């Protein structure tokens, strides 16, 4: 009888822990699946739609005061990866961004700021791995932060924002989409 009670308690606790797990989902991208033409850059020899993906998250840790989003290619032949998108100062009560949110200020929550991607623009810059290269592992990450505001502007580089995110992160969750051309 004691074993049954213990087992029941463990099952109940595991489902509570599962319910509180920080998760990221998307209708546009999937873990382990290549990005679609919608998330491919239009330039640098690529001919995609350059549309930021829909992202939704839940289960952020207690104490989360804001969120940030990054899209990063650690496999880019730059010596330091490639920042495709950074969004900071997303209020803690926001839990999703729609497809194409980066395309206009109205697509982002009030107060959110998009930093400069490595194409030199503020906003989303889609995937564009070199032709014939190995798959690049595009990391779409939502960061739960212990601060409500990062003091950056739209000219902030991905490297600066990445540094500030790591210094202020409570947790992060990501979808990795290996993509080649």
Kindly give the residue locations of the regions a language model identified.
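Bacterial N-terminal signal peptides that target proteins for export
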Residues: 1-6
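N-terminus-centered regions that define maturation/targeting leaders and the start
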Residues: 18-181
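Hydrophobic h-region of N-terminal signal peptides that target proteins for export
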Residues: 10-18
């Amino acid at each position: 009888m004691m074993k049954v009670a213990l087992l029941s308690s463990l099952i109940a606790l595991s489902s509570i822990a599962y319910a509180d797990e920080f998760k990221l989902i998307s209708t546009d991208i999937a873990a382990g699946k290549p990005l679609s033409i919608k998330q491919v850059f239009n330039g640098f020899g690529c001919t995609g739609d350059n549309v930021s993906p829909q992202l939704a998250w839940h289960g952020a840790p207690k104490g989360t005061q804001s969120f940030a989003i990054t899209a990063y290619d650690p496999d880019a032949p730059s010596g330091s990866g490639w920042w495709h998108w950074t969004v900071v100062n997303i209020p803690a009560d926001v839990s999703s961004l729609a497809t194409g949110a980066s395309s206009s200020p109205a697509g982002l929550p009030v107060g959110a700021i998009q930093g400069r991607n490595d194409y030199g623009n503020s906003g989303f810059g889609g995937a564009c791995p070199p032709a014939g290269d190995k798959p690049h592992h595009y990391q779409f990450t939502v960061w739960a932060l212990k601060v409500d505001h990062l003091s950056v502007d739209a000219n902030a580089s991905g490297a600066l924002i990445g540094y500030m995110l790591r210094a202020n992160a409570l947790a992060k969750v990501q979808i990795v989409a290996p993509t080649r051309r």
